[in-house]
């Protein structure tokens, strides 16, 4: 899927600022500046992407395309209070007391994942961005400011080791696809041209 409908108001602004929470995510490992833009996709399209993109890396490629489409001017990740474990729905609060900001959302996400104690470049969105040659490597990012040497050890989601697997049982997938996939309706006047 290379098309998505975005909220209309994006075109009303000269510059976009992405403000995300620092948290773990059972499907994507972590979620930060890039995944935050998923909120700009209209309505049921979000569910459609989740149902059709069952592999972490496939969904991550959509997030890379979405980020490149919106291109925020500034990306801020709020880690003053963050989330670890089974985020974003059932995680636990962590007082990380950190804010990450960058003009490059991928760089912000790499630094965030690294600070959380994750293999930053193995996270699906980072891996997709690296594969598409759209992002820099962690070692090439210069970090400045207070807390630049701060390191945390966030509890990882239970899915962390299986980031290449699908995340929903097949019967739920089938049910969801049936409900959210449009089907053509043939008009009785159709002459099969």
Descriptions of predicted regions:
Residues 1-189:
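Extended, low-polarity segments enriched in aliphatic/aromatic residues
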């Amino acid at each position: 899927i290379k098309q998505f409908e975005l909220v209309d108001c994006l075109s009303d602004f000269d510059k976009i600022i992405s403000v995300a929470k620092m948290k773990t995510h059972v499907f994507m490992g972590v979620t930060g500046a890039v995944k935050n833009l998923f909120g700009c996709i209209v309505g049921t399209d979000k569910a459609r992407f989740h149902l059709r993109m069952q592999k972490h890396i496939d969904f991550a490629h959509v997030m890379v395309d979405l980020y490149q489409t919106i291109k925020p001017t500034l990306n801020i990740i709020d880690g003053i209070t963050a989330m670890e474990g089974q985020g974003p729905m059932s995680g636990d609060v962590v007082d990380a007391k950190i804010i990450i900001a960058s003009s490059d959302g991928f760089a912000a996400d790499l630094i965030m994942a690294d600070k959380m104690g994750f293999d930053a470049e193995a996270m699906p969105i980072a891996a997709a961005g690296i594969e598409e040659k759209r992002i820099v490597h962690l070692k090439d990012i210069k970090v400045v400011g207070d807390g630049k040497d701060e390191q945390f050890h966030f509890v990882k989601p239970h899915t962390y080791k299986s980031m290449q697997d699908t995340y929903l049982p097949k019967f739920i997938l089938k049910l969801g696809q049936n409900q959210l996939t449009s089907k053509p309706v043939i008009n009785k006047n159709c002459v099969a041209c």
